[in-house]
C-alpha cells in the first residue's frame, strides 16, 4: 500500500496536539483525523480513536506492523514540517 497524499488540515501552535492530518493510500482510501502530538521524546502520530464507556481510547484504524507505522509517521511528519514552514513564511 502506497501513501499517495498527506494533507495537514489544521495546525496548532498551542498545546500538545500540533496538527490534524488526512492520509490517502493508493489514491483510493483515506484515513482522517490522524493527530500529530508533541511528546517528551519529540513528535509522534496518534491514529483516529474513540472513547469506550470505560474511558479507554481505542484506535479505529491503525497499522498492524512497525514498518508500516514508521513509514506512515515519517510521511506525516515530513508534510507537517513543510506546512509549518509555509505557515511561517506567510506570517512574514
Curated annotation (Swiss-Prot):
InterPro entries: SpoVG (IPR007170), SpoVG_sf (IPR036751). Signal peptide: none annotated. Keywords: Cell cycle, Cell division, Septation. The keyword Cell division applies. One of its GO terms (biological process) is division septum assembly. Could be involved in septation. Belongs to the SpoVG family. This is Putative septation protein SpoVG. It comes from Thermoanaerobacter pseudethanolicus (strain ATCC 33223 / 39E). The lineage of its organism: Bacteria, Bacillati, Bacillota, Clostridia, Thermoanaerobacterales. The gene is spoVG.
Amino acid at each position: 500500500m502506497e501513501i499517495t497524499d498527506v494533507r495537514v488540515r489544521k495546525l496548532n501552535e498551542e498545546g500538545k496536539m500540533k496538527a490534524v492530518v488526512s492520509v490517502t493510500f493508493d489514491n483510493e482510501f483515506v484515513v482522517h483525523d490522524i493527530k500529530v502530538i508533541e511528546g517528551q521524546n519529540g513528535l509522534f502520530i496518534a491514529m483516529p480513536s474513540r472513547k469506550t464507556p470505560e474511558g479507554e481510547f481505542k484506535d479505529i484504524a491503525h497499522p498492524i506492523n512497525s514498518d508500516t507505522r514508521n513509514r506512515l509517521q515519517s510521511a506525516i511528519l515530513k508534510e507537517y514540517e513543510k506546512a509549518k514552514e509555509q505557515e511561517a513564511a506567510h506570517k512574514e
